[in-house]
């Protein structure tokens, strides 16, 4: 029988209702300023900032606490070039052959295309992989539970942490992303989930004039 090991919840802090409203509003007012950026400066970012953001991502809840994620941080110029070439190859196929007209129409307001200069311009790329199973040092395979949901939550925390640090990001998902396994030498049990582009915005960076749905459109109270 497995022994359950529990410890007291000591770090929880309760706030007054008024303080909770203030804190939640402050967080919303800050996070709503976050924007997806496609034009990056090549200004360097302290590596410790990236590490701290990844530490935050690693606190995410996961199925059975198995933490089925792997983050690969890329700053090497040659590797970024390889990733760009791999991504643009898939994106060219997507825009010219694979994507249905409805999808391309939906993308038009965002001004996207198969050219991905940001993959070389930004100081950091983080390739995020999900694990369908983990492999112990002795070769034993351990099934992972809810890997996609778990990794998605971790990515959300990571994106919020990056914004909180004063940086901008872009979620990039060329399909398929198998080329990342080859370029980054990742094992078969790791599947590319997301490529996150991170850095400072270019001085002339522009973003689409888009709006988010309001609360009534996305929430039902029962």
Where are these regions (language model features)?
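Small-aliphatic-rich amphipathic alpha-helix that forms the alpha element of a beta-alpha
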Residues: 53-58, 126, 132-183
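Short, basic and Ser/Thr-rich N-terminal targeting/leader segments
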Residues: 65-68, 120-122, 191
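Glycine-rich, charged/polar anion/phosphate-binding loops
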Residues: 56-58, 109-114, 180-182, 205
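N-terminal accessory segments that position/regulate proteins before the catalytic core
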Residues: 1-37, 41-47, 51, 82-85
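Glycine/small-residue-rich phosphate/adenosyl-binding loop
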Residues: 73-151
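Glycine-rich phosphate/pyrophosphate-binding beta-alpha loops
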Residues: 58-65
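A glycine-rich helix N-cap at a beta->alpha junction
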Residues: 92-99, 185-207
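C-terminal helix-cap and adjacent tail motif
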Residues: 2-23, 113, 194-222
